[in-house]
């Protein structure tokens, strides 16, 4: 929460996407994200979305869905964070301000399919957090790397969480993000690095890259 808040402040982002490996972990963290989002949304009204195939079976989430005819900006609601039915469709899931969902919601940003630009639009204004990034197979890693490159091109801060990510894999992911930045901002290629790269070979734990 501290890292995401700092990134939101620095990059002036308007929300968070939190990608987790399973529906169970999403459900377990949903209430915590809702509580945190409410604490940082005192002066604004924001939408939250639980994005996975079993979201309709989460009782807490369904109890927070406001009625379709409720006009949030005209009628007083109990919380500064709400679940609006407009965001319930798969196409518009990532357009909510705060989204917690299975990691495939993020990986599909690199899958050519209908309405994929709505997914890019939803992610482009957020801080992206991906948990357990060491646990994916070779197939998922290809989509992870490509999605990270897309986010770098949009200037989206990406936070990857892992307790056991190998040094070599960390370098690959960081270099892929750098590639996305340089592809969209060619002048960066000519700039000299201003920060020491010693951390690239650092194996201490915990490590913030």
Predicted regions and their residues:
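Single conserved hydrophobic/aromatic residue that forms the stacking wall/gate
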Residues: 1-7, 11
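Conserved Walker A/P-loop ATP-binding site and its immediately adjacent core
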Residues: 15-36, 52-55, 169
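A substrate-engagement module of RecA-like helicase motors
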Residues: 31-98, 103-107
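Catalytic acidic motif of RecA-like/P-loop NTPases
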Residues: 104-107, 133-137, 163
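SF2 helicase catalytic motif II
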Residues: 119-144, 149
